[in-house]
């Protein structure tokens, strides 16, 4: 059975754990670098990316997560996770640099501009995925190595590169497990 960790420093940790378990994998909370040992994949949940980055640095998690990815292990970042995994963050904040694109934080606006949208994901077929965007980022300037999986208003909101999958929205806040299934079946 696949073992998936969820970075448990802030954000929708419990919701991701429930989604992982409902997809048939084992879920573990990751708070320290040693918690990465033995995992097949890692989820960086939504939350507040600046706060998450500061905590990751304080607990010395940045380099171990980069090393985890360099071993070919899969990482799935949602919302703030997308921001943290991007090569660059607009404004120059430090990131993990694992997907070759630039993240625009709060790209669709602040909390009051949160919204839902139907996304037609080729890999999923019908029906459309009901995506929940909360202070959502998006990606710009992807390299040729990045596969764009979904856009809203011509903005990249889901993408993958090698073993890295990112969404600007929160699949863990829905009852639709197709993103986690995709991660487990195609990436891990």
Curated annotation (Swiss-Prot):
One of its GO terms (cellular component) is glutaminase complex. Pfam families: SNO (PF01174). Its EC number is 4.3.3.6, 3.5.1.2. PROSITE patterns: PDXT_SNO_1, PDXT_SNO_2. GO terms for molecular function: glutaminase activity; pyridoxal 5'-phosphate synthase (glutamine hydrolysing) activity. The keyword Lyase applies. The keyword Secreted does not apply. Signal peptide: none annotated. Pathway: Cofactor biosynthesis; pyridoxal 5'-phosphate biosynthesis. Catalyzes the hydrolysis of glutamine to glutamate and ammonia as part of the biosynthesis of pyridoxal 5'-phosphate. The resulting ammonia molecule is channeled to the active site of PdxS. In the presence of PdxS, forms a dodecamer of heterodimers. Only shows activity in the heterodimer. This is Pyridoxal 5'-phosphate synthase subunit PdxT. It comes from Listeria monocytogenes serotype 4b (strain CLIP80459).
């Amino acid at each position: 059975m696949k073992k998936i960790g969820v970075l448990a420093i802030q954000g929708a940790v419990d919701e991701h754990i429930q989604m992982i378990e409902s997809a048939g994998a084992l879920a573990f909370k990751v708070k320290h670098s040693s918690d990465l040992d033995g995992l097949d994949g890692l989820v960086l949940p939504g939350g507040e990316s600046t706060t998450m980055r500061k905590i990751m640095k304080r607990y010395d998690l940045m380099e171990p997560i980069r090393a985890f990815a360099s071993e070919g292990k899969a990482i799935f970042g949602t919302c703030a996770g997308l921001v943290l995994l991007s090569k660059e963050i607009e404004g120059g904040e430090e990131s993990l640099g694992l997907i070759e694109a630039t993240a625009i934080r709060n790209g669709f606006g602040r909390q009051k501009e949160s919204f839902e949208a139907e996304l037609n994901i080729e890999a999923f077929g019908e029906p459309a995925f009901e995506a929940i965007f909360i202070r959502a980022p998006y990606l710009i300037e992807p390299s040729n190595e990045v596969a764009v999986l979904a856009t809203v208003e011509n903005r990249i909101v889901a993408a993958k590169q090698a073993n890295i999958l990112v969404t600007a929205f929160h699949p863990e806040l829905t009852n639709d497990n197709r993103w986690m299934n995709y991660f487990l079946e195609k990436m891990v």
